[in-house]
Amino acid sequence: MLIFDEVITGLRLSDGGASKYFGVTPDMTTLGKIVGGGMPLACYGGKLEIMQCVAPLGSVYQAGTLSGNPCAVAAGIETIRQIESIPNFYEELDRKSAMIENAIREKGLNVNRCGSLMTVFFNDERVKSYDEARACNTESYGRYYRHMLQSGIYTACLLYTSPSPRD
C-alpha cells in the first residue's frame, strides 16, 4: 500500500498535491490544515476498496474532536475558492518561488526548491539526502535563522501568490 502524507505538499505543489505534481497515484492520501485554510482541519482519502472499510460501511471506526468543525470547513471551502479564482495559480506561485530562489542564490547560498517549498542549506552542493543535510554547517544556519527572525522574516513560512516582486 502506498500512502502519501500531503500535510506539507497538499495544495502547495499542485491542486492534486505531490501526487499530481509527480504523476504518482497513491492508495491513500492525508492532508493537513491547508485544506482548512490554516484552521484545524485534516482529511484523508483513498481508493474505493480501502475507504469502504471505514464506518459506516466498514468495520474501521474513525472520529476526531474537531471532525466537521463548521468554521474550519468554511475556511477550507474558501481556500479552494480562492485558489480556483486566481488564473494560473500554480504557475504564478512557481514563478514567484523561482524569483525568491534566485535572490537567495545571488547571495551565494544553496537552496533546494520543489514548487513553492524551499529551504536554505549552508554547504557547497545541492543537498540530495538526509546525510548531506546533516553535514551542512548548522552553526551558520543558526546565525542566518536568528538574523532573519530579528529582521522580521520568517523562513519557515510557505509562499503564496500575494507577494509582489517588491516584497
Language-model features, listed with the residues they occupy:
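Active-site PLP attachment segment
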Residues: V24-C53, G68-A75
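Conserved small/polar residues in nucleotide/adenosyl-binding loops
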Residues: Y160-D167
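Structural motif of enzymes handling amino- and sulfur-group chemistry
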Residues: L66-I86
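Conserved PLP phosphate-binding loop immediately N-terminal to the Schiff-base lysine helix
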Residues: M1-F22, M28, I34
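Short beta-alpha connecting loops at secondary-structure transitions
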Residues: D27-T30, P56-T65, S85, Y130-A133
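Structural signature of PLP-dependent enzymes
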Residues: T79-N102, Y130-T138
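Conserved PLP-binding catalytic core of the aspartate aminotransferase-like
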Residues: A98, L109-R143
